[in-house]
A protein has these predicted regions:
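Conserved non-catalytic scaffold segment of RNase H-like nuclease domains
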Residues: 1-37, 83
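Short, low-complexity, polybasic intrinsically disordered segments
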Residues: 47-63
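Short, contiguous clusters of charged residues that form electrostatic/catalytic patches at enzyme active sites
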Residues: 15-18, 22, 70, 93-96, ...
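Short, flexible loop segments at boundaries between secondary-structure elements
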Residues: 59-77
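Non-catalytic, well-ordered alpha-helical scaffold segments
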Residues: 18, 44-45, 56, 66, ...
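Acidic, Mg2+-coordinating catalytic module of metal-dependent nucleases/exonucleases
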Residues: 31-41, 45-51, 77-117
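Tryptophan-centric aromatic hotspots in well-structured domains and transmembrane helices
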Residues: 23, 58-60, 75, 104-105
């Protein structure tokens, strides 16, 4: 599982931070890249402690997709449920699934009604 992959990895925390910064900086300026995902407060605390340069590069605001889930379940309990996740706990799968879930909320909950004046 995950622990085995971590133990076998040759990528140090410093190297991972550098690679991530290189990637993020290609797509977003400093203080404009928003951390997004499910239950990301622990992720942000990890970045603050272990990857401070990356943490400072990111915008201080975050989009926690799990907050959308909590609001929708309480405000619109009759609404269709968001897509289920594989729970593979692989970073790329988690990222894609979080984006898919956020897209689902946009298309099914936060859609703009057609109005004419």
């Amino acid at each position: 599982g995950l622990l085995e992959r971590v133990e076998k990895s040759q990528v140090t925390v410093d190297k991972a931070e550098k690679q991530t910064l290189e990637f993020v900086s290609k797509w977003a300026d400093k203080n404009s890249a928003t951390l997004c995902g499910n239950s990301i407060w622990v992720d942000r605390r990890f970045l603050h402690k272990e990857m401070p340069t990356l943490d400072k590069y990111l915008h201080y605001r975050m989009i926690d997709v799990s907050s959308f889930k909590e609001v929708v379940e309480r405000w619109y309990p009759e609404t269709l449920r968001a897509p289920t996740k594989k729970q593979s706990h692989l970073a790329m799968d988690d990222i894609k699934e979080s984006l898919e879930e956020l897209r689902w909320y946009r298309e099914n909950i936060f859609r703009q009604e057609n109005t004419t004046s």
